C-alpha cells in the first residue's frame, strides 16, 4: 500500500529524491488472524549529494521477511545519477546487495508413513523434497542481487521503470534443494493535482509489477490537506482494498498507517493486514540548493 513512499525499494533511481537526508522505517503484519502469517520489517537511509556540478544520491536499505517456516533477509546499497531534462529531472540508478533465505526444516511436521492418512501430516521423514538439516536454525542460502531503473520527475508528475533481481540468483540450500529468484519488472507513475483553494492536493498513482509468470497492479488515490494531513484509498487487482492515513507530526517527521482488507476468499480467515511507517527528513551538511522539485511523497 505504501509503494509511493518507498520507491527505492523497487526502483534504485528514486533513491535520495529531493534535497534532504531521509530515514525511513516500516513494519507490516500480513493477514492477521492466520497462524504464522507473514511479517515484514523495512529500513532505509538515503541522501542526495553534489560532486562539482553533478547531482547524485546514495542509500542503503534492509528488509526482513518472515512467512511461516521461511525467513528472508536482504541488504542493498543504492546509487543514482540525476540530471536536468526538459521540465524535470531524470535519474538513472542501480542497486546491489545480497539476499539470504532460510528455512526452518527442523520445524516441519514429520510423521511416519503409517500415520499419514490418520494425521494428515505434510511430509514423512524420507521425503526427498525436504532439504537436509543445516543445524539448529535449519538451512539457508545466499545470493548476489542486482537491480536497475530510471526515474523522471517534474513539478506535477513522476514516472519510473525498473527491473529487480537482474542476476536471478539461485539460493542453494543443499545438493538437493535450491530456490531460484525470478527477475521482476516494475512500472509506476503518479500525478499531483493542486485544487483551486491551494489547501488540497490530489495524488493519483499506479504501479504494475510482473515476473512474466504472474502480475499485479496497485491503484491509489491520495489526498493531502494543508501540507500536513494525508488520506486515501487503494486497490490491488490481486484482491485487496487499502485505507491509507498519514500526517506530519513536526517539521520533517511523518507517520503513516495502512489497513489492507482482503477482497477475496481470505476475508473469511483474516482480519486484514496492518502497516505502520515512520519517516524523517533532515539536513546536516546544508549543501547548496539544487532547485530540484520537492517530493510530494515526503513533504
Task: Put a short name on every predicted segment.
Residues 1-299:
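Subset of outer-membrane beta-barrel
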Amino acid at each position: 500500500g505504501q509503494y509511493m513512499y518507498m520507491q527505492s525499494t523497487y526502483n534504485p533511481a528514486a533513491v535520495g529524491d529531493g534535497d534532504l537526508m531521509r530515514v525511513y522505517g516500516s513494519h507490516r503484519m500480513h493477514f492477521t488472524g492466520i497462524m504464522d502469517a507473514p511479517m515484514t520489517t523495512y529500513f532505509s537511509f538515503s541522501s542526495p549529494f553534489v560532486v562539482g556540478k553533478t547531482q547524485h544520491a546514495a542509500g542503503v536499505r534492509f528488509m526482513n521477511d518472515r512467512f511461516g517456516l521461511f525467513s528472508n533477509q536482504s541488504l542493498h546499497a543504492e546509487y543514482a545519477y540525476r540530471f536536468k531534462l526538459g521540465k524535470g529531472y531524470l535519474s538513472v540508478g542501480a542497486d546491489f546487495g545480497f539476499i539470504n533465505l532460510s528455512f526452518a526444516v527442523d520445524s516441519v511436521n514429520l510423521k511416519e508413513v503409517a500415520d499419514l492418512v490418520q494425521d494428515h501430516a505434510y511430509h514423512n521423514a524420507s521425503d526427498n523434497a525436504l532439504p537436509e538439516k543445516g543445524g539448529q536454525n535449519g538451512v539457508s542460502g545466499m545470493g548476489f542481487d542486482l537491480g536497475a531503473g530510471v526515474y523522471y520527475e517534474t513539478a506535477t508528475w513522476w514516472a519510473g521503470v525498473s527491473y529487480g533481481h537482474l542476476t536471478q540468483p539461485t539460493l542453494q540450500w543443499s545438493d538437493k534443494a535450491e530456490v531460484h529468484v525470478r527477475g521482476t519488472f516494475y512500472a509506476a507513475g503518479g500525478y499531483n493535482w493542486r485544487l483551486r483553494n491551494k489547501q488540497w492536493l490530489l495524488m493519483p498513482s499506479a504501479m504494475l509489477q510482473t515476473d512474466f509468470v504472474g502480475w499485479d497492479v496497485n491503484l491509489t488515490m491520495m489526498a493531502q490537506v494543508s501540507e500536513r494531513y494525508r488520506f486515501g484509498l487503494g486497490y490491488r487487482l490481486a484482491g485487496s482494498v487499502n485505507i491509507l492515513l498519514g500526517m506530519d507530526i513536526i517539521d520533517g517527521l511523518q507517520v503513516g498507517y495502512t489497513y489492507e482488507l482482503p477482497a477475496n476468499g481470505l476475508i473469511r480467515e483474516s482480519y486484514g493486514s496492518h502497516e505502520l511507517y515512520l519517516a524523517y527528513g533532515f539536513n546536516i551538511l546544508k549543501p547548496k540548493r539544487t532547485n530540484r522539485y520537492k517530493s510530494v511523497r515526503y513533504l
